[in-house]
Amino acid sequence: MRSMDIERYPFSRMESSFDKEYQMKQFMDDNFLLKTKTAQILFHDYAKDEMIYDYHCHLIPQEIAENKRFTTITDAWLGGDHYKWRVMRANGVDEALVTGKDTDPFDKFVAWAETLERAMGNPLYHWTHLELQRYFGITEPLNKRSAKAIYDEANRQFKENEALSVKGIMKEFKVYAVGTTDDPADDLAWHKNIAGQADFPSKVIPSYRPDKALGIEKSDFVAYIQKLSAAAGMEIASISDVVAALVKRLDFFVSMGCRASDHALVTGVAIFKSEAEVNAIFTKRMEGAALSDEEIEAYKTFVLTALARAYSKRDIAMQLHFASIRDNNGKMFAALGPDTGYDASHDLSLAAKLSAFLNNLSVTGEVPKTILYT
């Protein structure tokens, strides 16, 4: 560059002006996602130290009761998180590094770190680094180069820091209560165990999820009705018995602190038939016959309506989770089972049937507190 250009464009002054106007931000600093001054005040001055009430989670009650200690960060992050598994597969990671039982935990962690490098903008990228910062005090971005150091440091802390046990984490982060996801036939033994621990820092309460009782089209429906019958201590020979058994188990859940139900539905259900008609459908299925789509929806409408009325009477919130196509990969379902990263979003119409279902409850003033997910 010529001397006259240097005089015309004094780099030192340009850099000073630029630095003043555009200060380099720390990677995911304390104001991450807090874009305005108002947001920063609301979070830091009010929300930050509030107790956590997680009313919809998939934590395992036994692991909570036994105060599980993770041996590696791979165990904590990749032992069962099918959201991470899904994005690893999208990155072309071999299945052995995703769910392999005999794969070295460090190799799995490196595969996750390499995947994360390509996932910037995905919530998993944010969650991963927030967890590294808040639980381990690690502020370095996770990638292939940093994986070994982060792996070793996190594992050291898991081994030495009691605050990183399940109970320790719940205490450290001021978890007031969590609502686990539980089947009506569950005996809630681990919830009882936790409730009996005088020093336990949080409430662990069941949430009522009767998907198997509504899944009349499923191959294991008949076996499940037998299981529900045993749990309720009553014979189930009719649709009225199904409802009675479910309500009986709901009351047991309520006695254990339950405040919410949870239902996974592909779309809304709104085929209203009489009890006699639905009883014929139930009997037909229990005898091993196949049902039409209309019969399946009529059964689900009847049972869900009865449960919604029971929720309303008991002040139980009803969570309805729509629009997922489950278990799309039959080969991997056979190998790994459900909830392993092979669900997808559905494109069926929802609004009309959901409106009709809720309106039917509204006529009699029996709409429970309702939370909708897609």
Briefly describe each language-model feature range.
Residues 290-374:
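Long, well-ordered mid-to-C-terminal structural blocks that present hydrophobic/aromatic surfaces
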Residues 14, 60-62, 325:
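Alpha-helical and His/Cys-centered functional microenvironments
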Residues 1-10:
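Intrinsically disordered, low-complexity segments enriched in serine/proline and basic residues
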Residues 23-314, 366-374:
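Metal-cofactor-binding active-site regions of metalloenzymes
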Residues 11-23:
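Short, Lys/Arg-enriched N-terminal segments with co-localized hydrophobic residues
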